[in-house]
Design a protein with these regions (language model features):
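Glycine- and acidic
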Residues: 46-50, 54, 111-117, 226-229
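Structural signal for hydrophobic packing residues in well-ordered secondary-structure cores
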Residues: 33, 64, 68-71, 75, ...
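Alpha-helical packing segments of well-folded alpha/beta enzyme cores
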Residues: 25, 56, 60-63, 67, ...
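Residue-level signal for inorganic ion chemistry
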Residues: 29, 104, 254
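C-terminal extensions of enzymes
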Residues: 41-47, 201-256
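Glycine-rich phosphate/ribose-binding loops and adjacent secondary-structure elements
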Residues: 58-61, 70, 74, 83-200
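Electropositive phosphate-/nucleotide-binding environments in soluble metabolic enzymes
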Residues: 19, 23, 54-61, 94, ...
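Non-catalytic, usually N-terminal nucleic-acid engagement modules in DNA/RNA processing proteins
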Residues: 1-77, 186, 190-194, 222
Length: 256
């Protein structure tokens, strides 16, 4: 249940209720020792109507003020610096996104996040909102796009001025047999790999790519061996790291 004070969750373990407020979330993130602490916000569905999106943004802005009050009145617990990143919201409405970006830019945080995208809206609308927001957010602070995305999404985000990303896709899709490669997507459950004893990816970015064959990895998935999940996750994470390293090289060279 969500209200002005915060959000009440019911434990899936014992049914107990727990209230998360902006203040409590800041305290938890201090205790965790997060290098980057994220503001407490509402991530409204991408299909939200305008009035709900506007109401949600107002709540997120009020919660942000409470987050900064708590953050500024507490100290790191473990002797190293922690940063608080506010989160731009506003669904797919340009005026709300502009309002949110301007409000957050005024906070002069050490970095800023863009949230509430890749949550059901069309991909082109996501790119449009990134452009709207990054016209406003300062260029000398990291701009972090939350929960995105596919390799193409990441390159398109970089093109539009995004500096940081996070996403479950490399590991979640990997656990389901999907490998991202330099030559496209491979579904390792497919029968086509059954007798393919070539390396997973001969020019891949990870040591697992030449250590195991495609046929063996397919066998592991069909045998429901946990090793399959590990190999696929390692491969996909290495691919994503290779992708952004290549993007960085081309940015520095001026030919991205």
């Amino acid at each position: 249940k969500m209200r002005e004070e915060g959000v009440e969750f019911r434990s899936h373990i014992d049914g107990s209720k727990h209230l998360f407020t902006p203040e409590r979330v800041m305290d938890i993130e201090r205790t965790i020792g997060a290098d980057i602490m994220m503001a407490f916000d509402e991530c409204a569905p991408g299909t939200s109507d305008y009035e709900y999106a506007k109401k949600s943004l107002g709540l997120t802005e009020r919660w942000l003020n409470r987050c900064f009050d708590r953050f500024n009145s507490t100290e790191p617990k473990y002797g190293y610096h922690q940063s608080l990143f506010p989160i731009v919201q506003g669904c797919v409405y340009p005026d709300l996104r502009k309002r949110s970006a301007e409000y957050i830019a005024s906070k002069n945080a050490e970095g800023n996040a863009i949230g509430g995208l890749a949550v059901g809206e069309p991909t082109e609308k996501m790119y449009e909102m990134i452009e709207v927001v990054n016209e406003i957010l300062p260029t000398d602070k990291p701009r972090y796009l939350m929960g995105v995305g596919t390799p193409v999404n990441i390159l398109e985000g970089i093109e539009r001025g995004v500096d940081m990303f996070d996403c479950v896709m490399p590991t979640r899709n990997g656990r389901n047999g999907m490998l991202f490669t330099k030559h496209g997507i491979m579904n390792m459950r497919n029968k086509k790999w059954e007798k393919d004893y070539s390396p997973i990816e001969a020019d891949g970015a990870s040591y697992v790519d030449t250590l195991y064959s495609r046929a063996y990895l397919r066998h592991l998935f069909h045998a429901q061996e946990l090793l399959a999940l590990q190999i696929a996750s390692i491969h996909n994470l290495a691919f994503y790291l290779w992708l952004v390293k290549e993007a960085r090289k081309h940015i520095i060279a001026g030919d991205f």
